[in-house]
Amino acid sequence: MSENRLAAKLTKVDKAAILLLSLGETDAAQVLRHMGPKEVQRVGVAMASMRNVHREQVEQVMGEFVEVVGDQTSLGVGADGYIRKMLTQALGEDKANNLIDRILLGGSTSGLDSLKWMEPRAVADVIRYEHPQIQAIVVAYLDPDQAAEVLSHFDHKVRLDIVLRVSSLNTVQPSALKELNLILEKQFAGNSNATRTTMGGVKRAADIMNYLDSSIEGQLMDSIREVDEDLSGQIEDLMFVFDNLADVDDRGIQALLREVSSDVLVLALKGSDEAIREKVFKNMSKRAAELLRDDLEAKGPVRVSEVEGAQKEILTIARRMAESGDIVLGGKGGEEMI
């Protein structure tokens, strides 16, 4: 088999994994230091799954790297909480720990950036007794899924205050970021260089709300509506909910269905409106659609929480696919969310 055909089977993430596995630990750490937690997690997954890589593939990847060495590649997303686990599977516990330590202690990671590598509960503990505005800045700085998990470790009153503050954030002055980094760097190494940073806002609040459990999301939205009805409307307009899947194009729905198990799909559709059901049926084979209809009819009563859980699972998959460019989503107000 030719080198080109071998390399053609590799994704960009696979090639990145091969490249890093070919480097020494120190050099790999230098490369990974310039990636975010999600990028490292995805490369770590690829490294863990590498089996029987041909010498020709390694040579081809190296050759391509030399040709495009000046380019930057965005590697997509994954779950932050599993980074250490995935790197351990890929490299072994000692090497994974050394690699992560080098990334975090290498001198280019700010205190805020270090929080992205921590478990959500640990982040919540770090900021629990800080001023509410500091809590809001930290939550706005995190990726929406991690931010939502951090919020879940606070009581409702604190969650409401943080989300309202995130919604009103626009830009953060360098002096404020520098002070916050200094506070955090008492525990984490890094530098405190800062530029005027855009973070927060209604869109960020909506993104975070999207990742909250349904019960927390509903309670929080009700409270926001009581405080500021106009703001709650703006947030809702930018949120993406299950019924919005009816507006996703056919190719996107087909791609999404390939990633969703039939059991989860049946549960999710039990609580959906007719438009989303027809959208799903339309994008399945005739036989598969008939089987799904039969499963829906045969399915007995289910708890609302089970339906909401299944819908959240599908939405999580959809958002991940949107962030990697596989599908395009739109919020209630039709604004594009990539």
From Swiss-Prot:
It is found in: Cell inner membrane; Bacterial flagellum basal body. The keyword Ligase does not apply. The record marks R165 as: Part of the EHPQR-motif. One of its GO terms (biological process) is bacterial-type flagellum-dependent cell motility. InterPro entries: Flg_Motor_Flig, Flg_Motor_Flig_C, FliG_a-hlx, FliG_M, FliG_N. One of its GO terms (cellular component) is bacterial-type flagellum basal body. Gene3D superfamilies: 1.10.220.30. A motif (Part of the EHPQR-motif) lies at residues 130-133. Keywords: Bacterial flagellum, Cell inner membrane, Cell membrane, Chemotaxis, Flagellar rotation, Membrane. GO terms for molecular function: cytoskeletal motor activity. It is a peripheral membrane protein. FliG is one of three proteins (FliG, FliN, FliM) that forms the rotor-mounted switch complex (C ring), located at the base of the basal body. This complex interacts with the CheY and CheZ chemotaxis proteins, in addition to contacting components of the motor that determine the direction of flagellar rotation. Belongs to the FliG family. This is Flagellar motor switch protein FliG. It comes from Pseudomonas aeruginosa (strain ATCC 15692 / DSM 22644 / CIP 104116 / JCM 14847 / LMG 12228 / 1C / PRS 101 / PAO1). The lineage of its organism: Bacteria, Pseudomonadati, Pseudomonadota, Gammaproteobacteria, Pseudomonadales. The gene is fliG.
